[in-house]
């Protein structure tokens, strides 16, 4: 009933489309039952297999992958980089300000203006402070990079969101965006870390491929029909793609999430 009400609302408002992303399985099923289109894609997630610490996690990886991660972490340490992290209301205004510098720099380096402004993050800090975890990389006490992680404490899930650096340090991106968050997840009993869309390279850090589903409704019948045909072909390929990725598992026994 809710899905049909949404469609009627979209039609009444002359909207061209409706989209539901990152939905719960029951909501996806309700939309499918109502005839909406489903799109299957792949993301890369890390799963906590009751690891005691980061070393225990590394022992779950193939020897080559363990060696690579240790080398990358050593490069950051030898560059004089140290990390600190803050959560919730412990994130100071100065930390938020520095983070925004990093966030802005990332976009400007790619020739784009940042699509979120400083006030947006200030509101997040006020309205939902406990959902944020900030890592700050420092050299000699001076901040040089940061990464912002979103948290869902009830489900034990962390989401890699934004990162940026004011200077280039070899392997700093991997440390700030993967190894520090994973170490934190292990220490705090979080069960999953989602590193965002795309990126088969994330498998080298034990983020494993997971099928995700989004829901779509298009108002124009001919356009909807064309998209539906495309999605049918795309879905056929997703299964094969997941099988190929599973063969490249970095885990010692090839087990997936």
Over which residues does each language-model region extend?
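Conserved acyl-donor/pantetheine-binding loop and adjacent beta-alpha core of acyl/acetyltransferases
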Residues: 1, 157, 222-225
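A conserved beta-strand-loop-helix scaffold within acyl/acetyltransferase catalytic domains
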Residues: 3-171, 216-217, 232, 249-257
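A structural signal for short secondary-structure junctions
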Residues: 127-130, 141-142, 150-155, 172, ...
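C-terminal structured "cap/appendage" subdomains that terminate the fold
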Residues: 189-194, 198-233
């Amino acid at each position: 009933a809710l899905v049909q009400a949404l469609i009627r609302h979209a039609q009444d408002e002359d909207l061209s489309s409706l989209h539901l992303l990152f939905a719960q399985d029951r909501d996806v099923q309700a939309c499918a039952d109502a005839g909406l289109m489903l799109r299957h894609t792949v993301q890369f997630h890390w799963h906590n297999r009751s690891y005691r610490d980061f070393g225990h996690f590394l022992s779950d990886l193939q020897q080559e992958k363990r060696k690579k991660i240790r080398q990358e972490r050593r490069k950051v340490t030898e560059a004089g980089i140290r990390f600190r992290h803050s959560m919730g209301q412990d994130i100071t205004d100065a930390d938020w300000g520095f983070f925004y510098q990093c966030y802005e720099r990332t976009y400007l380096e790619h020739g784009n203006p940042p699509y979120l402004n400083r006030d947006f993050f200030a509101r997040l800090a006020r309205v939902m402070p406990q959902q944020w975890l900030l890592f700050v990389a420092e050299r000699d006490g001076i901040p040089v990079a940061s990464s912002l992680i979103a948290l869902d404490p009830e489900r034990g899930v962390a989401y890699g969101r934004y990162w940026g650096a004011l200077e280039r340090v070899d392997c700093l991106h991997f440390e700030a965006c993967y190894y520090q968050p994973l170490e934190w997840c292990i220490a705090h009993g979080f069960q999953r870390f989602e590193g965002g869309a795309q990126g088969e390279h994330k498998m080298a850090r034990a983020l494993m491929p997971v099928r995700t589903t989004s829901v779509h409704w298009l108002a124009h019948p001919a356009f909807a029909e064309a998209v539906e045909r495309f999605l049918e072909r795309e879905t056929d390929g997703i299964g094969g793609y997941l099988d190929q990725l599973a063969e490249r598992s970095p885990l010692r026994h090839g087990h997936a999430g």
